[in-house]
């Protein structure tokens, strides 16, 4: 176990949070809960000293239009696929969502807030490193709205949080193997697994083991995965080198460099329905003309070709064994 590498991976949650915060501030996205997590991130940094506090303040400065647009497309794609999963359930049916490497994601709170019936119908699990989970638990417990949404009754000082509708797990995904039982999970429920730039940080054999656990434990399941592609081209190689300069290694970019290799990856794992597309296609084809017009009006973007090249090197995969 490489503690330095773990800390680098944990720090990427701050990157994702600050990017989403910038997109929210510019009007690309709506998130009524993000300010709580930004404040929590700044508070945690302040406790580590002036250097960390200054770094976090700089991190939450507005992003370039290119980054804001890419962040919007990422969240739009995941939103569409989560909505697709939920739309397939029958009225009153209970389903389960398991988010790998959830970090500061606010999705469960938004789902429960937007539709009160979701509180009884969506069992939500979030998995991340213990240090990330403890910070998220503290943010939840310090806010009455979040406490009510998750159904928390009292402040439990143990790692994580467990209620009737929400489970926050401090688990290292590398420890998951055959026979592992996720506390509070219900394998009988239709289950959606979300991996937003999570499995990509694991070594291929470790990620394969997690996917095998999912397919064996949750036989009625769908995986929605978002991660980068190298494309086996110069741009992808530059991405890999830039990440390496920050101490970030993404093994999946080499092991699964293309859409075709990602599709084959999940077919080999036993999934019967596997679809994959790059984010440039989502940008051009998944947005309505009205939404395209709206986001074009938010900021001037003179790097359309650069944006599409960047988006081409990220993908979303839908792999399903859901019972019809």
UniProtKB/Swiss-Prot annotation:
Catalytic activity field: [phosphatase 2A protein]-C-terminal L-leucine + S-adenosyl-L-methionine = [phosphatase 2A protein]-C-terminal L-leucine methyl ester + S-adenosyl-L-homocysteine
Cited InterPro entries: LCMT1 (IPR016651), Ppm1/Ppm2/Tcmp (IPR007213), SAM-dependent_MTases_sf (IPR029063)
UniProt entry tagged with the keyword Transferase: yes
Pfam families: LCM
Family: Belongs to the methyltransferase superfamily. LCMT family.
Enzyme class: transferase
Entry protein name: Leucine carboxyl methyltransferase 1
GO BP of this protein: methylation
Transmembrane segments: none
Protein task: Methylates the carboxyl group of the C-terminal leucine residue of protein phosphatase 2A catalytic subunits to form alpha-leucine ester residues.
Protein's organism: Yarrowia lipolytica (strain CLIB 122 / E 150)
SUPFAM superfamilies named in the record: S-adenosyl-L-methionine-dependent methyltransferases
Positions annotated to bind S-adenosyl-L-methionine: 74, 101, 128, 172-173, 196
EC number(s) reported in the record: 2.1.1.233
């Amino acid at each position: 176990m490489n503690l330095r590498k773990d800390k680098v991976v944990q720090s990427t949650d701050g990157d994702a949070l600050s990017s989403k915060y910038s997109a929210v501030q510019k009007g690309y996205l709506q998130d009524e809960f993000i300010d709580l997590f930004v404040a929590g991130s700044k508070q945690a940094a302040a406790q580590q000293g002036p250097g960390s506090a200054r770094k976090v303040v700089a991190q939450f400065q507005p992003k370039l239009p290119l980054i804001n647009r890419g962040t919007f497309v990422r969240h739009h794609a995941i939103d569409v696929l989560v909505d697709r999963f939920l739309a397939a359930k029958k009225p009153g049916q209970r389903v389960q969502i398991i988010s790998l490497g959830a970090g500061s994601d606010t999705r469960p709170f938004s789902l429960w807030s937007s539709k009160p019936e979701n509180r009884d119908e969506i069992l939500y699990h979030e998995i991340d490193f213990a240090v990330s989970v403890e910070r998220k638990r503290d943010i939840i417990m310090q806010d009455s709205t979040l406490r009510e949404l998750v159904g928390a009754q009292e402040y439990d000082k143990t790692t994580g949080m467990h209620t009737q509708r929400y489970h926050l797990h401090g688990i290292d995904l590398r420890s998951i193997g055959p026979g592992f039982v996720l506390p509070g999970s219900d394998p009988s429920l239709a289950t959606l697994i979300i991996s937003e730039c999570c499995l990509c940080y694991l070594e291929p054999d470790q990620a394969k083991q997690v996917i095998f656990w999912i397919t064996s434990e949750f036989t009625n399941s769908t995986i929605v995965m978002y991660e980068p592609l190298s494309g086996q081209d110069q741009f992808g190689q530059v991405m890999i080198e830039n990440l390496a300069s920050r101490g970030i290694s993404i093994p999946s970019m080499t092991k699964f460099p293309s859409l075709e290799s990602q599709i084959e990856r999940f077919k080999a794992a036993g999934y019967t329905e596997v679809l994959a597309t790059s984010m440039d296609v989502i940008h051009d084809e998944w947005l309505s003309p009205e939404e395209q017009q709206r986001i074009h009006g938010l900021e001037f973007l003179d790097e359309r070709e650069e944006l599409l090249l960047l988006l081409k090197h990220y993908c979303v995969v839908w792999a399903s064994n859901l019972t019809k």
